Amino acid sequence: HLSSRRQRQMCIRDRVIKRLGVSRTPIREALLRLEDEGLVQIFPQSGTYVSKIKIEAVLESQFIREALECSVARYAARKRNDELLERLSRKLEDYETALNDDEVKLMYEKDEEFHHTLANFCFPNRLWKITNQAKLQMDRVRHLSLAVQERRINVLKEHRWIFQNIADGNEDRAENAMKKHLEYFHHDLKIVQDEHPDYFKE
């Protein structure tokens, strides 16, 4: 994953082609798309590099995600049903299992699935796709922040609080719980910046 590689590390196109067993054309198109999303930089004479993380882009990403997902939390609390609550409960259990097993990659996936479940409950087609696109830059930091044990534990606590307020049908508290959960990202960003200053660009 791009966020877990050293920033500015060269992406060897031929190595990717060999590993995936595909032609140059789709790889080139994929790299151009990543460049458009600000994730890589392409230099025709020297190669393709992972872009440094731009603080402004990360904060914009977080702002958009918060606006979308706080509305999702309100909607879920208002329209909740047994099926939604059962699905969310399973996601919480899955995350806790991954946490106990110290499976960081799986924790990230289960974190995503919790939010994905809520988005799909509201509008099952485009909402998560839009959210996912909006949070691309933010996700680069999130991958790095899960290396911190305390954050892994807090994610579960925050998800449980979101779940409880949705289950209670309390729209204001559900929205506030989601807002606090997503705002904690600013704390995560500071930690990651302090630990990996060379990954970032102002």
Segments the model singles out, each with a brief description of its role:
Residues 51-84, 127:
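Conserved segment of winged-helix/HTH DNA-binding domains
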Residues 35-45, 49-52:
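Beta-hairpin "wing" of winged helix-turn-helix
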Residues 171-202:
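C-terminal effector-binding regulatory domain of bacterial HTH transcription factors
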Residues 23:
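Helix-turn-helix DNA-binding motif, specifically the short coil turn and the N-cap/start of the second
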Residues 61, 78-144, 157-165, 173-184:
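Conserved amphipathic alpha-helical segments that form helical-bundle/coiled-coil interaction surfaces
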Residues 1-8, 12:
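Single conserved hydrophobic/aromatic residue that forms the stacking wall/gate
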Residues 15, 19, 33, 37:
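Residues within the alpha-helical elements of helix-turn-helix
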